[in-house]
Amino acid sequence: NITPASIRSMITRKTKAIVCVHLAGWPCEMDKIMELANEFDLFVIEDCAQAHGAKFKGKAVGSIGHIGCWSFCQDKIMTTGGEGGMVTTNDESLWRKIWAYKDHGKSYEAIYEREHPEGFRWLHETFGSNYRMTEMQAVIGRIQLKKMNEWHSKRLDNAYKIWSVAKGCKGLRVSEVPDYIEHAAYKCYVFVKPDELKESWSRDRIIKE
């Protein structure tokens, strides 16, 4: 994962936001990243595509930064029947911009909060694209959301069983997850220590045999 130090080294006068990726389900160090963002007046966008269910110090990922982005692609923790995604935020002004962008620049205020005379209504006030989810996809997603807690618990339990065994195997290395991190275990990484393997053995040979 990126670190506050690596982010700081990349910040310039042109920097507007920090995109932190909770890679493989392991949350970034959000406290220090948010402090850094406040120092430079930057937005923080959490990429939670691989981190459904993960938490940082008891807070769900996607709820710490200014915006959370989620993937529902077919190979992610949950899916909406192929492709899909979600954006979350507690900032209403950002939400209105996101809402408009996903529907060809259509204004939420113009549709729901403005009186119009009879006849044609011009509702598109900015640029945008089509990111509207179909109703069938939404149904699939809503059902899977109800199962997320159960899936998360089972996946994490399986991952820790694998890591527990791998820790006792010479030639293998397992990353230590801090107590304040709740991993989503989208990936269950176990690393090979090449210098501890016998001659002619490698990561690829282990996988093959």
Give residue spans per PLM region:
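PLP-dependent aminotransferase class I/II
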Residues: 2-5, 9, 17-21, 26, ...
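Amphipathic alpha-helical segments within well-ordered protein domains
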Residues: 82-83, 142
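A structure-centric signal for secondary-structure junctions around beta-strands
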Residues: 64-66, 81-82, 133-135, 185
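Active-site phosphate-binding strand-loop segment of PLP-dependent enzymes
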Residues: 2-80, 86-94
